[in-house]
Amino acid sequence: MNQQPKYRIYATLLDAFGAYLNSDVIWDKYWGWSENPPHTPEEFHEQQFQELIDRINRKPFDSEAADKGTAFNEVIDCMVENRKSETVQVEKIYKVIREGACDETGKPLYYDEVQTNEVIGLKATYNNRVFTFPISLCREFSGYFKGALTQQRVEAIIPTAYGNVLVYGVIDELMPASVHDIKTTGSYTVGKFKDHHQHLVYPYALMK
């Protein structure tokens, strides 16, 4: 049987296609209640279509949120693999103690800042942007993913009526019995990522 793919589709491209198909539902979820939405449903539909085309054409885009996710992911991978990063500049942030004196009203007269040896965070510089992450969060993630295989590319063929389709993607953390995609988000609600395709594509590819 000929397994040469006629099409190649990555997981986030499927997400963009889904967002285009469901643009009315998405618009109603975020702006249906608003008296002054940033765009009409028709404008949002066209915006989602353009984002899909840009994804297909691999058009570069600049996103602080995406850069933050990339930086955090690399920090965790470096801690899991006990290595230095070649793409993200990582520096330790140390706890600073202020020592000084106040007058009888409590107004500070002077103070000195003394840097301790206690690490409280990591500063990650990526794509000319600087992000800080609490060390407790980084240790929690890296401890959970200890022993994981990081950034594993997977792919598989799906036979369809239109020809063989190669679906592929990169798993952030591959554990012996589970697959993990690390997300950073400004706000989270249960099920926020349930319609994304990573959790469908990655297990399917691993089983093939």
Language-model features: locations:
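Metal-dependent nuclease catalytic cores that hydrolyze phosphodiester bonds in DNA/RNA
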Residues: 1-171
